Regions:
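Short, highly charged C-terminal tails/helix-capping segments
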Residues: 126-159
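Short solvent-exposed loop/turn micro-motifs enriched in small/polar/acidic residues
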Residues: 12, 22, 34-36, 75-78
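Short, internal acidic amphipathic alpha-helical interface segments
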Residues: 53-94
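Amphipathic alpha-helical segments
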Residues: 1-18
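Ser/Thr-rich, low-complexity intrinsically disordered terminal regions
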Residues: 20-40, 45-51
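Short amphipathic alpha-helical segments
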Residues: 3-7, 62-67, 106, 110, ...
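A generic structural motif
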Residues: 56-60, 97-106
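A contiguous, mid-protein "functional segment" used to position or interact
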Residues: 101-138
Length: 159
């Protein structure tokens, strides 16, 4: 059986992902998305488990209860990771995998899950937790003739 670091090294070498190895046990991987252009995910090899930690979005400005309800409902059907908040209220995807279970297929499934959950939840989380900021940004751009291209997904909040 390969050591977890060797498995992760082999996986990253065979996939077109941007990453850096912070130290011998920590890999910082940038996953490309669509709604959320990039998701930064850390894989951290511990004594007994591989920790997964990916930033999703900062602390919501409003409707925190609705945001948390959304996250808890999503958690019920997710594979190997779950939404969590840190001490600042920022939202992350977190998980643990026993070191004995670390193989390339599982790393692929976990990184795929991180990407899918972060990307598919990004716009709904923005709508729930930042709708006032989106409306202000829309008005500001319209008043200055700025592009609304990256706000088009939220047009229904304005009209």
């Amino acid at each position: 059986m390969l050591e977890p670091a060797a498995v992760i090294d082999d996986f990253l070498a065979s996939h077109d992902l941007n990453y850096e190895q912070k130290d011998e046990n920590t890999y910082l991987i940038t996953l490309p998305g669509e709604a959320k252009q990039q998701t930064h995910c850390a894989l951290i090899i511990g004594d007994h488990s591989l920790r997964i930690n990916a930033f999703v979005i900062r602390k919501p400005d409003e409707n925190k209860e609705k945001v948390y309800e959304y996250l808890l409902n999503k958690n019920a059907s997710m594979y190997s990771i779950a939404f969590a908040i840190n001490e600042l209220g920022d939202i992350y995807l977190v998980g643990r995998l026993p070191l004995k279970a670390v193989n390339e297929q599982e790393i692929d499934r976990i990184l795929g899950a991180v990407l899918q959950y972060a990307d598919s939840s990004f716009n709904p989380l923005l709508e729930l937790g930042f709708s006032s900021a989106i409306r202000r940004e829309w008005a500001w751009r319209v008043s200055r003739g700025e592009s609304l291209a990256n706000l088009k997904a939220f047009e229904h909040l304005i009209l």
